[in-house]
Amino acid sequence: MLGLRQRAADDPTTEAGAVPAEEAPRRPRSPLRHAITLVLALAMTVLWAFLATLVLDASAWPAPLNALRHKSFESPALWESVAVVWVFVLLVVALIGRLWIALGIVTAITALIGVVNLTKLELRNDPLYPSDVVFLGQPSFLFEMVSKAKLVEGAVGLVLIVVLAAGFGWLMNKLFPGVPRSLSGRGLLGLRIVRVVVVLVCLGLLNLAGNFNDPGNPWRAAFDSTGLRWRNWDQRVNYQRNGFVSGLLFNMHITAMNEPKGYSKAAVDKIAEKYAAEAARMNQGRTGSLDKTNVVTILSEGFSDPTWLKSLKYAATPIPRTEALMKKTVSGKMLAPGYGSGTANVEFEVLTGLSMSQLEPQVSVAYEQLVSQHKTFPSAVQYFLDHGHTPVAIHPFSPRMYARPAVYKAFGFDRFISKDQMQDTRHGGGRFIDDQSAFDEVLHQIKDHQQPVFTHLVTMQNHMPFGGQYTDPLEPTGLPKNFAKLAGQYGRGIARTDQEFASFLAALKKLPEPTAVVFWGDHLPPQIYPQSLFKTEGLRNMHQTPFVIWSSGTPLKHTTLPTTSPTQLLPHLFDAMNVPIPPWYALLDTLDQQIPAMDAGLYINGQDEEVKRADLTPEARKALTDYRMIMYDFSVGKRYSEKTMYENAPTG
């Protein structure tokens, strides 16, 4: 496999009776030469694995070349990472059978992964996860998410790397030829056996790496023995401090949630009975009803209030109508579980009441890694079905994103309308279907149904990338020029959303039946703010977006709620509308009184203070323990409590 082809003897003499050169027997190599060749070849694979590891580690930093110089040896698990990459290198060499060609292929793969990781970090502030492989089947999404300039740069760079790698492999193969083509018999058979054995061993080791999070996994034990700290609360830092390979392995498949201590049917039933009694107590004073009211939940892509950032100054707020509305109805700040991305996870939290912060950190997209694995999944859709609503989900983009068709079906939605089924598909100058078209689709659904409708809308207008959409940007001061231009495009986009949302509410007021609306932004936009802003603004401020709860019927009393998790938005709607609730929402209300908002490693108490889990009050810890038990039962467990916790509450 790794040997060098013997050069044919080329004796120019033509004496009588001499055997022609091409028919002369090859001189066998000495065992020493074989050993030296093998050692050198193996050394090259180790060197390539080492270099590939350094390149991948550097791709987790904003300035990769600088990281290569100053950060290359910081990972405590560097050599364990090299070992994993080396196994992959050996696999490619054994499969290809030509050392230098195989190393060229490894170089190209390393470059591709590094570029993709760096680009994803720039655009979404998140590193590359194993679960991102699903996007390979959605090239249209990738092309729309990345600017044309980035695509051209990436394509040219990749082609250049592949050409250079192929040329290098070709040249080295000429200088150091491989196994002779004429090799036959036992020699060829032996070579093939060795290659097959290497392939099988490498596949076995890589399979172990793929099960990195299994109890007793030897790879995990080796990495843990180095003393590295898994930064599960911040995956970007996790990849930077522990290395790309460590971060990637850490995010391999895992059970979504660890079983809480004492989980059993008896324990779950006891909690369910407790909150059934609490719901009955709360419902005694609730006389409202949603039975004849349309309910619309609107996840507004990338919507935020940039004036909340102290570093930015605008001549006028981009969202004056929304700000005015927040002073008239129920509203507040939502603590988004992510920055620049995580739309599907915010959806998951709102519709299920289950917090991403309580799942294992390796669950990067709950829709794909949890919900889509089930035929049914407990959600608010069941509540609305029980109250006579027709549930409809609308998303003006590709239907395949984040396994939404399977997820919405599991939740219980009757229909999912993607961009292919929408009646209006205007773009309004932007890359994606605009919010006016999305709001019009909601109006169509309400008008087309006799019974009340529960409509869940996820918009696309303000999705990245930003740049070149609008001719009338709203640029702030306080940002570097290149960021200010992008922020100006974003500012104009949310200004249009602000206007279109106000028009949508005005249209709802004209309908004969009442409609309740929950509107929120899923996260701050990626790409437009420098990393330095996190230091000046603070992590919490970079994760807060506005939310509004509004009714076209009886106006809701103005209330500014404490900082809220997405899981609490529907409970706040039910509170504002004074409607009876099932036990699950009684549990969420109880949790809200103690911990209104939480994120990975962060809890905000009733006094709006950031506290660690260990510093929670006994009441808060008890509510969280109950919540985690039922959450596990819903998501991973036996669902002993589903029927009781979602039991239809009597209408007022």
Which residues are covered by each model-predicted region?
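Short, solvent-exposed loop/edge-beta patches enriched in aromatic
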Residues: 95-97, 288-299, 328-330
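Short hydrophobic "helix-edge" motifs at membrane interfaces and signal-peptide entry regions
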Residues: 87-88, 290-292, 511-513
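Solvent-exposed soluble domains appended to multi-pass membrane proteins
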Residues: 280-286, 300, 305-652
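Transmembrane and membrane-interface helices of multi-pass
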Residues: 2-238
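Membrane-interface micro-motifs in multi-pass membrane enzymes
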Residues: 130, 239-244, 340-341, 433
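Short secondary-structure junctions and interdomain/linker hinges
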Residues: 119, 146-153, 166, 178-179, ...
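Membrane-interface segments at or immediately adjacent to transmembrane helices
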Residues: 207-297
